[in-house]
Amino acid sequence: LGVIGLELGQSLHRLGVDIVGIDMAESIGGISDPDVNKEAIQLIGKEFPLWLGTGAAISEGENGQLVVTAGDNSKSVDKVLVAIGRKPNLASLNLEAAGIELDDRGIPVYDRHTMQIGDSHIFIAGDVSGERPLLHEAGDEGRIAGHNAVSASITAFRRKTPLNITFSDPNVC
């Protein structure tokens, strides 16, 4: 259950909507510390069920309902909120024709301190980098990419410490 799924799920739950949080990962809210994750799961799990570590399937149920199944769990629901992030849409750019090396996700290989793609005159910023699709990160990347795109020489910047904040209750940082 990622950051957006957790934030929206908890908000909807507190507005009276029956919620189940499902994720293939064993963590919630982007938490990387195992002890913090365990505590967060216990706290959030008191509010609504968390089905973690398993994929989910959706099928048609009775009376227009949907049936969500994840592992041994199953629930009939009226609506499903899918918060799975987004994949950068680069395929139509045919970057390979420009000699741009792509990683195994189809994202250009770039220097995160200059935002320069390889040795090219192309710079990358924002969600398309596939690194941290967050507004404040995109702003930082855009500042670096823009500076280097118009400068006579490329400058490697020291990136800001990435913030990972989930606006849940309790807040998770």
Task: Annotate the PLM regions.
Residues 3-63, 133-139, 147, 151-173:
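Rossmann-like dinucleotide-binding cores of NAD(P)H-dependent redox enzymes
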Residues 61-74, 80:
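Conserved beta-strand-loop-beta-strand element in the redox core of flavoprotein oxidoreductases
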Residues 69, 96, 167:
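Residue-level detector of conserved, well-ordered beta-strand and adjacent loop positions
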Residues 1, 15-18, 76-77, 119-120:
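Short coil/turn connectors at secondary-structure junctions
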Residues 1-2, 127:
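Glycine-rich Rossmann-fold phosphate-binding loop(s) that bind the pyrophosphate
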Residues 75, 79-153:
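FAD-site-proximal beta/loop scaffold in flavoenzymes
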